[in-house]
A protein has these predicted regions:
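N-terminal loops that bind phosphate or other acidic moieties
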Residues: 1-46, 230-232
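Long, contiguous binding/interaction regions
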Residues: 45-237
Length: 237
């Protein structure tokens, strides 16, 4: 445990300080949970550009955390999903009706496996983003809604989806989550946000229209295609 904590602290140092070019700790003496660095070499230089682009794995985007007030006056924390959210996500899904799950996944799903939930919570923040609305209480945390975008290999377009707990509709969560996702994907440099839903999912169709999506109802296919350009008018001109 001691070594793990030491490595985490070194990793945090590298993540936070883009100016570090080289860090050499040698020798390092360990005695139980105590460590003594006898010699440290640190090379630094000015860094210009995306500070996170130099990292093999993009770290947790703490800057995306935001407290949002719902229509009922309660506050929810909007934040990127974490690997440890798996049990919270399982509990959230159990409070979504089969009808709403069918609208989201286009099939009847009886149960999500551990692998399914792991894939939903253990994500590469550079290629995928899932933002959850979390309510905190004395009993702990609970997920109220989630929105997700998965980009293509070129990081140009992204497929999106949004799901809110069935007993919490009407609080503006879906809209606020999707607005948050639109802002993130636009800032991330993506060009277009795409999604599909069903014609009888009127709530999603109405929300998409309000947020400026192009809505293409394809009754023959039984789907509604949703598409939003993320490129500002100034850039297009």
């Amino acid at each position: 445990a001691g070594l793990s904590q030491f490595l985490v602290k070194v990793s945090n140092l590298i993540v936070d300080c883009a100016e570090i070019q080289r860090l050499d700790i040698h020798p390092l003496l360990a005695s139980g949970n105590e460590f003594t660095a006898l010699d440290v070499t640190l090379d630094i230089a000015p860094f210009i550009g995306d500070r996170e682009s130099r990292l093999a794995i993009r770290p947790y985007p703490l800057h995306l955390e935001e407290w949002v007030e719902m229509k009922n006056g309660e506050r929810a924390l909007f934040r990127p999903i974490l690997p440890e959210d798996e049990p919270l996500l399982r509990a959230f899904i159990s409070q979504v009706t089969k009808e709403d799950l069918y609208y989201r996944y286009f099939s009847e799903i009886n149960e999500f496996t551990h692998d399914d939930l792991a894939n939903m919570t253990q994500i590469d923040y550079d290629r995928e983003m899932a933002i959850v609305a979390v309510r905190r209480s004395e009993e702990g945390e609970e997920i109220l809604g989630v929105t997700r975008a998965i980009s293509d290999p070129d990081n140009v377009d992204a497929e999106f989806a949004v799901l809110v707990r069935s007993d919490l509709k009407g609080l503006g969560l879906g809209r606020r989550l999707l607005e948050k996702l639109i802002g993130y994907t636009r800032d991330h440099g993506l060009s277009r946000l795409n999604g599909i839903t069903m014609p009888n999912n009127r709530g999603m169709v109405t929300l998409a229209r309000k947020l400026g999506f192009d809505v293409d109802i394809q009754l023959d296919e039984g789907i509604v295609s949703l598409s939003l350009s993320l490129i500002s008018t100034d850039k297009q001109e």
